[in-house]
Each structure stands twice: as structure tokens, then as C-alpha cells.
Amino acid sequence: MNKEHLLKVDPIPDVTIKRGPLRSFLITKPCDNLSSLRTVTSSKEKLLVGCLLIFTAIVRLHNISLPNSVVFGENEVGTFVSQYVNNIFFTDVHPPLVAMLYATVSSVFGYKGLFNYGNIGTEYTANVPYVAMRFFSATLGIVSVLVLYLTLRVSGVKIAVAAICAVCFAIENSFVTLSRFTLIEGPFVFFMACAVYFFRRSELYLPNSCKANKSLLAASIALGFAVSSKWAGLFTIAWAGIIVLWRVWFMIGDLSRPIGSSIKYMAFQFTCLLAIPAFIYFLIFSVHIKTLNVNGISSSFFPAEFRKTLKYNNVIKETVAEVAVGSAVSLNHVGTAGGYLHSHLHNYPAGSMQQQVTLYPHIDQNNKWIIELAEHPNENVTSFQNLTDGTIIKLRQLKNGCRLHSHDHKPPVSQNADWQKEVSCYGYEGFEGDINDDWIIEIDKKRSEPGPAQEHIRAIETKFRLKHYLTGCYLFSHPEKLPEWGFGQQEVTCAYFAREDLTSWYIEENENEISLPNPEKVSYKKMSFWQKFVAIHKFMFYLNNYMDTSHAYSSEPKTWPLMLRGIDFWNENGREVYFLGNAVLWWSVTAFICTFIIGVAVELLAWKLGVNILRDKHIINFHYQVFQYLLGFAAHYFPYFFVGQKLFLYDYLPAYYFGILAFGHALDLISTYISNKRNNTGYIVVAIFMVVCFYFFSEHSPLIYATGWSSNLCKRSKWLGSWDFYCNSLLLSDSHYELNAES
């Protein structure tokens, strides 16, 4: 490969348009030498790729052991790694693949899962292989740079421009920072990038050919890994599906192709892109469920049927089936993972100021209630009496003697909901209560087990509602947490209008001094894999929808393209890791996307006026490729406007990756047209852009590598006033650091 080859070989073949009987049509069959033009085949290009990898490795691995303490995000992922090593069950908002990979790496290096990750800044001990885990993440980041280069090549970017774009990506501050730590986002970007590359590579070969199918298979596997790392992988699958439809649209318009082959192509593509990722996703969760077989804190949010399958669980082995007047019972909520009806010796700060009633996910004495007939409170029961549909009861707390109570007060958190009333625990030992303590049992026959459980209350098997006798509202709970004064437990109210499952309850523990001879016992049924799979995903949805959305460094999607603010990952002794993108590349991508959209609108207007557009093969390829990548950008960006969960700037990186691919084609077009007129001037322009990117990277590298820098340099590096990395705690200049060291 000589200089002429590096700069001048054109990977864009001519566009072939033929005349048909009624219309002209585009030939969609790839030319015979397309794959050789757009893949790494020569020894000199392989050498170039090797140099690119070495450069990227230096950038990504430099001082990877620093800081030697926990940074933002590592405390969460590290905790999951420890639980994996000890087989303790947990569930995160993300699928488990990345945590499994980090756990595998840590186990290889002898980690026993005993380190308490605690808070950001906790110093790692010698028995934590944090460098190995960071090295694993960085290695995937290094390969991601190669994958970006290869993706640009298969989509028609010239070797020199693809290499320059890859260098810009290698020194993109946000991707460098993300790949150097034990985080979920780095491996996810790698899997997504691989999926994009192999999917685009399949276009180089004849549809349904062996080589095309191999690339499609690799893309589908990568998609499976991506969606098993973050649900954002679903956006990548959706993008690939849209591109398949885009390709088929052109194929159907190609009169030289039978329509049957186009339909066969579409069916095979969708089968692979959906079935293979789904299989991998289920497989990963199967391993996850089988590996984590020890009861943990997270399992308390799962149904007892689920917890029963875990080692060292505290689920009752069996309980007396028949529930009667005088039974001491615990009531479990059906509709949420909140747990048991609970009351503790703390009052509401407003409203009635009576004792709080909540849902509590752990087994506790404050969960136990005595069932009394409403007309005979405090009665010493001497005979066994079943609880049937319509029975009016009171529930007296076993430990404190107060009764479950509702009245015309606003609930503690849902104060603006007129359809809810406060529920409290009111009274004391010896007090007979009042009519506000009365509740009517309504058995839910549809949800209850067929048979006797539909006729009277049986533990575990009967699902029922409790209707307040005086007001007609139903005992209700929903995924709304009480503030600090309620210990973050789940709110319980009395609701007039609500989903049936949110007003449904069942009895778990059931103790009665007066029981039938040889009382029947019942227990929870064991869950199948599919039932566990569904239960885990219900809880993941719950976490995504109801977890706290506030954070000091959370941000809104509308601010991401402008990068108004970064994220403080770590800060200690005048050194800081601050997540921030390379503003030169970041803002260039944003500007290009806006310019392209405006340009396309102008072109469409010109076309409407009869102007011939898109006649040059380079312009055609530019639009074809950029349109596909900007679809990927949109698919990974706009869904976040409709997501209610806590979001951070790094959630923009998958969309940004697609934006970089599109921008690479803009640089390629610039180099092509300027160089055609002025020799290699276009490449010089692109190289200058790379140098400016490197300047920003170098200037802000202390925020990546946690190295010291002066206050003056730090302040000069704030291109925007909203970038809030710390400068005031630093010494004024390097000379002051030297004097400080000497003293």
C-alpha cells in the first residue's frame, strides 16, 4: 500500500441505473470487488490498524490504577460483582451480563467478594482486583476504536479519513473516561459497536450469501450481548429492523430481483435479528438465576414463591390453611413488591398524627395483626369461625394493640389525590376502637385458588380486598415511598378508585390457638424459570419507573447535544475525575446533524422545483450512509425524552457514537471534494481537525487520569461556565506545586 493507495483509492463504486419497461430502476446487487475495497486486505493497512491499536492502548491504559479508590458507578457495579462471587441474589435496573463479566474477571484474579464498596472514595484493599476489572473494560474500549474504523471502512469512508476519525474517537474524553473504570456503559458501547459493524458489513455481499449470513449472525450475537447489558440495546435492534425495511424497499424497486427473494431476505433478517438476541437474553438470565441461589436483601422485594427457591430463605415452610376469627396473621400486598402490612411506633408528622401504617418488605413482629369481629372486639375467642365474604372485621396489631384505621384525612404523601384517604393505626390495649376501624372482607374469586379458597379466607390461596365500612374506600398501596420520617417504606392509603391488584391482599403467616383437629397446612408453590424471569422483569420495571429520579449530576436529554455540564466521578486532594466529552468533536457532531437536516430540507425543496440532485456517486453514498447512521442516532436519543428514570450525560454516548459515524462521512466528503480541486488539501483540513481534538484532549487529560494541574490551567480549561469541575482548591501554577513538594 503506497501513499497513492492510502489517499486516492475510491471505495465508492458507480451507481448502476437501468431502464425498465415502465421506469428506470436502481441495481441493488453489490459490485464484485466491493468487499475488497471496503475491508482491511493489504499488509500496509493492517500495519496502520496495528499502530491505531497501540496508540489507543496508550491513551486508554495510562495510569489505569489511578485513582486507587472507588469512583462514581464503581460502587454500584462492584457491589453486584461481590454478590455474584458469593452467589447472593440481587436485581439491578440493567440486565446482568456486564456484572457477570466483571465477576468472572475478578474471580480469575482470586477475589472472594468480601470488599465493602461503600461510598465513592472508599480506598481499594489489596485483595480487590480493581485494576484487572478496569483493564478488561479498557480493552473493550480499545477494540471499540478498531470497530469504529472498520465500520467507517465498510460504509465507504477512505482509509486515511477513517483512520483520522478513529484517532478522534480514541481521544474522545468521554469514551476514554468511561472505558477506564468498572462501569456498565463501556462494555455496552462495545457490544453495540460490534453489532453495527457486522450488520453494515453484511451489505458488502450478495443477500442471503454465506458471507452475508455470517456477518448477520455475528451482528445478531452482538445485539444479544448488547440487550443483555442494557435495555438500550433494544434501540439498536429497532434501528437494525428499520434498516432492513429500508434495504428491502430498494430491493423491491430493483426490477432485476424477484420479489420472492426480497421477501425471503427480509424474513431471514428479522428471524436472526429477533430470535438470536432473544435466545441470548434468556440464556444470560438463566445463568443469572441459577448462579444467584442465596437469599439476599434484594430478594425481600420478590414474591415468597420466588424466595422459597433461594438458600437460607426465611419464607415459612408451611402455615395453617384455614384462617379464623382470633388468628394472628401477616397480610401481603399482591400488586407491588412492597411487602407486608406494617405499623411501627412512629406517627405521621401531619394529618391525624396517628401511628404510621406502611408496607415493609421484611419479616417483622410489627407485621402481625389479630383478626377480630367488628361487633366483638377484644373478645376471648373459644370456637373456630371461618372468615367468609362480607364478614366485617377489625385488625388489631399484635405488638402495639392499635387497630387499622381510616378517616377523612389526606394521605401523607399522595396529598393531592382526592380519591385516597389516610390509613393509620389508632388505639391501645383494652380500647374497643370505633367504626373507623371496621373493614369488610371481599374475596376476589378470580385471583383465588379454585375451591374452598373462593368461599372463605385461606392462607396464601385466597386473594381478598378490605373495604372500609364507613367510607367505602379500599385498603390500597402503590409504589410511592414515604420520606425520611417514614423510613422510605411504601405508602398505604384507602382508595376509592384503583387497580384491583393494588387493593388485593393475601394472608401469609397464620397462627391460631383454637384450630381444627389435624389442621390442613399450605405452602407456597415453587416458581418455574419462566415465572422467575417474569418476576425479575416486573421488579426491574418497578425500579426503572419508581426509583428516585433526582441526583446532583442527573441531566435532561435536551441538554446532552450541547454538553452543558459533565459528571464528577471522583474528587480527592486536588485531583479529580470528571466525565466530559471532547467538546471539539461533540459540538461538531451536533452542528453537523443540524446542518444535514437543513441541507436535506433544501435539497427536497430544490427537487420539488425540478432541480436534479444526488447525481454524483459520492453525494449519493454520503446521503445513504448518513441517513442510516442518523436513524441510529435518533433511535438511541429520542426515546429518553419519554423515560421517567434518572438519566445522566453518559446515556447519550450510544447516540453520540452513531453521530460520530455520520460525521466521519462528512469529513470524508470534505476531503474528497477539496482534494479533487487542490491535491491533498482536504486531508490536511481533516488532519487539522484531528489536531484540534487532540488539543482539547490533552488540555483536559487531568480530568481523565486524575493527575494534578494548576488552578490557572483548570480555569482556562472551562470552555463553558456551567462545567463545574473544581479549580478553587488547586494551587495557582505548576511552580507552586514544585515549591510545595520541596517544602
Swiss-Prot record:
Its EC number is 2.4.1.109. Pathway: Protein modification; protein glycosylation. GO terms for biological process: fungal-type cell wall biogenesis; protein O-linked mannosylation; regulation of endoplasmic reticulum unfolded protein response. The chain crosses the membrane at residues 47-67, 130-150, 159-179, 181-201, 232-252, 265-285, 584-604, 624-644, 647-667, 684-704. It is found in: Endoplasmic reticulum membrane. Pfam families: MIR, PMT, PMT_4TMC. Keywords: Endoplasmic reticulum, Glycoprotein, Glycosyltransferase, Membrane, Repeat, Transferase, Transmembrane, Transmembrane helix. Glycans are attached at residues 33, 213, 380, 386. SUPFAM superfamilies: MIR domain. It comes from the Eukaryota. Residues 1-46, 151-158, 202-231, 286-583, 645-646, 705-743 are lumenal. It catalyses: a di-trans,poly-cis-dolichyl beta-D-mannosyl phosphate + L-seryl-[protein] = 3-O-(alpha-D-mannosyl)-L-seryl-[protein] + a di-trans,poly-cis-dolichyl phosphate + H(+); a di-trans,poly-cis-dolichyl beta-D-mannosyl phosphate + L-threonyl-[protein] = 3-O-(alpha-D-mannosyl)-L-threonyl-[protein] + a di-trans,poly-cis-dolichyl phosphate + H(+). The keyword Transmembrane helix applies. Residues 68-129, 180, 253-264, 605-623, 668-683 are cytoplasmic. GO terms for molecular function: dolichyl-phosphate-mannose-protein mannosyltransferase activity. It is a multi-pass membrane protein. GO terms for cellular component: dolichyl-phosphate-mannose-protein mannosyltransferase Pmt5p-Pmt2p dimer complex; dolichyl-phosphate-mannose-protein mannosyltransferase Pmt5p-Pmt3p dimer complex; endoplasmic reticulum; endoplasmic reticulum membrane. Disulfide bonds: none annotated. Protein O-mannosyltransferase involved in O-glycosylation which is essential for cell wall rigidity. Forms a heterodimeric complex with PMT3 and more rarely with PMT2 to transfer mannose from Dol-P-mannose to Ser or Thr residues on proteins. PMT3 and PMT5 form a functional heterodimer. Also forms a minor complex with PMT2. Belongs to the glycosyltransferase 39 family. This is Dolichyl-phosphate-mannose--protein mannosyltransferase 5. It comes from Saccharomyces cerevisiae (strain ATCC 204508 / S288c).
